[in-house]
Amino acid sequence: MKKLLLLTASLLWAACLALALAATADAAPRAIGGFFKQTHQKNYMARDQRGEYNLLHKSVSGIGVDKELRASYPLLTKAINEINQGEFQRIEELSNRMKDEAAAFRETAPDYYHPFQYEFDVLMRRADTMAVSFLQYEYTGGSGVHGMYHWQGVNLSTVTGAPLPLEAVVRDKKALAGAICERLRADYPDSPFEQLEEKIVEKALTDQLNWTLDPQGLTFYFNPYEIASYAEGLLTATILFKERPDLFQGPCRQPAAAYAQPFPAYYPLTTSLRDNGERDVISVYEAKGSVHVVLNGTDNAFPVDLADLQPVLIHMEDGRNYLYIDGTRQGKSIRNTLVVQLGSRSARYVDTLAYSFRHTIAVAPRVQEYWHFLTNPNGFCIDQESPFISTSKTDICAIGENGTLTFG
């Protein structure tokens, strides 16, 4: 029965690909935009003999699509809405349990009490006329020694909204498992990785691998305790399409000529900047009033005082590569965007834009907070800098010849 279900899923995805190719005149995918997220934050309060106290702080984000994207891809919109509804229902049930647990913790250990925390966030990974891929991030902080977090990849057909099975992209799961193990041991040489091969092969053959479809390859995610200790954190393994062409199949292997790929700060992004299968590793962090871009082992520091970094890799048709790094000005509620051009090892400062991907609407009783996702460098929304408590103004832009914004 399991094999029959997998075969059925593969056949359905093959049909999805046929529809996608019929819907697009050219075989190569084109980047699409129009994705955003809305963030809701809430503090749940309670009262006991010691007074009023905070039970739980909850922050929840869900992916949204704009009017144009809804009209162009109604089935994708429906699938995303269903994913959101399912997650929001699960989160509501979980937060109710966490409130009960927090109240019990307050009663049994008042001297050690602290509010519980819950966060659910989303981050786009790829968006084009062939496939849409994004990450879900979940964090729970309770009465334990440390909180727990989890990253989960979601992969969908852009045309039909159907889930993308790994079989549609990978020829041989066992060979893929070997490549993942090889990559993990190369990227994390100090990790003992007990019984790594057995664990990864089992995950691959039982469809338990956690992955995203990136423009240049597949990235696999291993959360704390999955294959290593909690202290080692999230581990990732990226296999590039042109690095191992023997492993992959299907039209998803071809990236859009121009694309933008958001990625989490403090975690490395592996890609191929020249689209030739050669690995480029990028990471971004802030320290001592500077933003640091580490490119293929070379640390490039830029004296721009930003925090809470939200980086995006931008690849243009002519091969130019940029980072747009959105961040909060230290000590202020406004956000700006640092623009950096990437070479093979060095990064060059281009500009600091008085713009951010954060969009705010100042309405009672609280400010509504949205974030634009940059996935199509030839057309996207970005907001003029604005304090958090005010309504920000949105401009429609594209990436210009020098890496800065063009308007219209």
Residue map of PLM features:
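Blade-terminus and WD-like Trp-Asp/Gly-His loop motifs, strongest in beta-propeller folds
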Residues: 316-317, 373-375
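Repeated scaffold domains used in trafficking and secretory/extracellular systems
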Residues: 307-314, 355-371
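Compositionally biased intrinsically disordered regions enriched in Thr/Gly
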Residues: 25-274, 285-292, 299-317, 333-335, ...
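Hydrophobic beta-strand segments that make up the repeating blades of beta-propeller
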Residues: 281-284, 321-327
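Positively charged n-region of N-terminal signal peptides that target proteins for export
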Residues: 1-4
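Surface-exposed loop/turn elements that mediate protein-protein interactions on large endomembrane-trafficking
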Residues: 290-304, 338-355, 395-407
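Bacterial N-terminal signal peptides
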Residues: 9-20
